[in-house]
UniProtKB/Swiss-Prot annotation:
Induces TNF-alpha release through human Toll-like receptor 2 (TLR2) signaling pathway, leading to macrophage apoptosis. Coiled coil: none annotated. Keywords: Cell outer membrane, Cell wall, Membrane, Secreted, Virulence. This is PE-PGRS family protein PE_PGRS33. It comes from Mycobacterium tuberculosis (strain CDC 1551 / Oshkosh). GO terms for cellular component: cell outer membrane; cell surface; extracellular region. It is found in: Secreted, Cell wall; Cell surface; Cell outer membrane. Contains an N-terminal PE domain, followed by a conserved linker region and a C-terminal PGRS domain. The lineage of its organism: Bacteria, Bacillati, Actinomycetota, Actinomycetes, Mycobacteriales. Residues 140-230 are annotated as: Interacts with TLR2. Its main location: secreted. Interacts with human TLR2.
Amino acid sequence: MSFVVTIPEALAAVATDLAGIGSTIGTANAAAAVPTTTVLAAAADEVSAAMAALFSGHAQAYQALSAQAALFHEQFVRALTAGAGSYAAAEAASAAPLEGVLDVINAPALALLGRPLIGNGANGAPGTGANGGDGGILIGNGGAGGSGAAGMPGGNGGAAGLFGNGGAGGAGGNVASGTAGFGGAGGAGGNGGLLFGAGGAGGVGGLAADAGDGGAGGDGGLFFGVGGAGGAGGTGTNVTGGAGGAGGNGGLLFGAGGVGGVGGDGVAFLGTAPGGPGGAGGAGGLFGVGGAGGAGGIGLVGNGGAGGSGGSALLWGDGGAGGAGGVGSTTGGAGGAGGNAGLLVGAGGAGGAGALGGGATGVGGAGGNGGTAGLLFGAGGAGGAGGFGFGGAGGAGGLGGKAGLIGDGGDGGAGGNGTGAKGGDGGAGGGAILVGNGGNGGNAGSGTPNGSAGTGGAGGLLGKNGMNGLP
């Protein structure tokens, strides 16, 4: 038995496009009709007259053929438009009885548990901070949380059923600029389906003098599912930027951890306002990678926020990268540490880079350390580079991560350059164990004096030692 799958909206869009093409061709034919069907003879002789008549005849034949083609095109567009309307009407007519069937199926579950068997949860109303409704017990996505009123937290996203995605958390409420108060925290994302489904993203923190933190991402499903991303921290206008929310954990068996939220920026009109720290990346499942850490927020008049640490894997998978530090007008934010690999196999996550420290005495942020590799196979994560000290010392480079039994150690991060102060020290390279080379040490940052170069990591039993960094 054959069947046809049709999308009425797509058919209607194609019909509209075809109508536009026909109109364009018709306009072009009309513009060309007069100069091509009445070709003037080049001279008064018989040959010129015959050639002009020949060309005019060809043009008239083309115009007649074009008229027939335009008629066919118009009929085809009408048929296509009518077909799209018929399919849409049939779809609407068949959906109504199905809704009644779903109501009958869901009624007992709603009466006993307050939750349908099949269907998506309701979204929280904006400005109320209400939580999103949970999805159907069997199949259904969680509803999104409602945004918060001024200074109030956003609602949490609803959880999914056995199959479905968690709802996104609502945004925290803002507080008007120049007004004292705390921004509302973003709502947490709902968890994914118990068996399959992704976690919902966390809500964004509210803008205020003391900004709200971003909401945590929801966890993925038990078997398969990606963790939700953490919400970004709100912008702080006088006190501090909000912290980024942590990424949700991946599914227990298969799934990547969610990315950590970005820290909120600190924008001070009076006093100082450091940037908020980035959120940590979520842990991966037994077979899955850890989520990357969120970047730290910028401190326009204050320190930059630290980058979030990368999430670690459980059994088989790479660790997440650490988030970069936020630029600060005084001290740059430190980079987040890279996540560790799974217990058996995987590479360690790279450490995040330290950020620039501005101002007359600005100090660069330190680079994050690289993550450790799995016990059997895997390379250590590279250390993050230290930040540049615009008016002060450079940041130290992060340490390279250790390798597994088979794998190379991670390279150490380079030290940041300092201006009128000491350069940052290079990070040491990570060591290898059995088969693999040690990581190279990070180069020293220039300054007054220069920093110390990082030492190379020890090589494995079957491997070479890493090279020391350049002084």
